[in-house]
From Swiss-Prot:
Name of the protein this chain belongs to: Protein E7
Domain of life: Viruses
One Pfam family named in its UniProt record: E7
Zinc finger (unnamed) stretch: 58-94
């Protein structure tokens, strides 16, 4: 635009559609043998284990029994289900009793 006032003849519109762009990618991927090696290494790794302290009562004399176990998260949840169910822990004093 030239001048102080805007007039319609100063505005030029270019109303041609843009050139179409192909959206297909023709790029070739490189060999992924390194990725396969990483996947194998991750599969061979053992799951992460932690120490868990369990304080419960003896089913015979109601004395406190402390256990320390090392297992995975899934295994400790299974142990919790067993302890809340029918599994009972016996202290060393009550163990020899029938």
């Amino acid at each position: 635009m030239h001048g102080r006032l805007v007039t319609l003849k100063d505005i030029v519109l270019d109303l041609q559609p843009p050139d179409p762009v192909g959206l297909h990618c023709y790029e070739q991927l490189e060999d992924s043998s390194e990725d396969e090696v990483d996947k194998v290494d991750k599969q061979d790794a053992q799951p992460l284990t932690q120490h868990y302290q369990i304080l419960t009562c003896c089913c015979g004399c109601d004395s406190n029994v402390r256990l320390v176990v090392e297992c995975t998260d899934g295994d400790i949840r299974q142990l919790q289900d067993l302890l809340l169910g029918t599994l009972n822990i016996v202290c060393p004093i009550c163990a020899p009793k029938p």
